[in-house]
Amino acid sequence: RDLVRSRGLGDVYKRQLLLTHNMKNTDYNWTAGIYGINVDSNGEVTLSVLIRSEVTITGKPKNGKGNDVVFKFKIKKWFTSLGATSSNTWDIINTSCSYGQMPSSLELAQRPSGGVVPRKVGTLWGEYGNLKTYGNAFSSTDYWTSTQLMGVHEKFNPETGISELGTGKSSGLCVEYY
């Protein structure tokens, strides 16, 4: 068993349960037993509310044979877009993260290698990929980060995962830690 996506995204959190040893999510009936959590037949977990405690997901074999499969996880970071309409200077966006803070570019994605940003657990873009595919929450072309080089803050591209030095206005992104 393995888990991906330890970060919340926008107003809804999704997490895909991964099984090993030729096991299939569709062979199990999934339950969480907590309000605000839904697990579909493909093993995708959706949290419609932020749950700060550890979450346990249980899969019972549909054929009644074999052991239950149990997944446990806890949200460590919750990322929220201030929306594409929040386009403003870095200083104004930074003060808009009153319930958290602006993330660093390395929390959002690793640096590209050969022009490609790696997809792997540990960063928001690494776990979710193109954030623009998740609806209007990440529809802006770029977002300010807390990362600063030579006195200039970086902007993060939610489509490519690449951060570059930026000026002018951009949208806001905040992160809360748990």
Where are these regions (language model features)?
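Single conserved hydrophobic/aromatic residue that forms the stacking wall/gate
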Residues: 2-13
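Strand-loop-strand motifs at the edges of beta-sheets in extracellular beta-sandwich domains
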Residues: 33-50, 161
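Extracellular/periplasmic catalytic domains that process cell-envelope and extracellular macromolecules
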Residues: 51, 66-68, 96-97, 135-139, ...
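Exposed beta-strand face motif in extracellular beta-rich ectodomains
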Residues: 51-57
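Short, structured beta-strand segments at or near domain termini in extracellular proteins/domains
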Residues: 57-59, 64, 69-77, 144, ...
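Conserved hydrophobic ligand-interaction patch in extracellular adhesion modules
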Residues: 76-148
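Short, polar loop/linker segments at the starts of domains and inter-domain junctions
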Residues: 85-95, 152-165
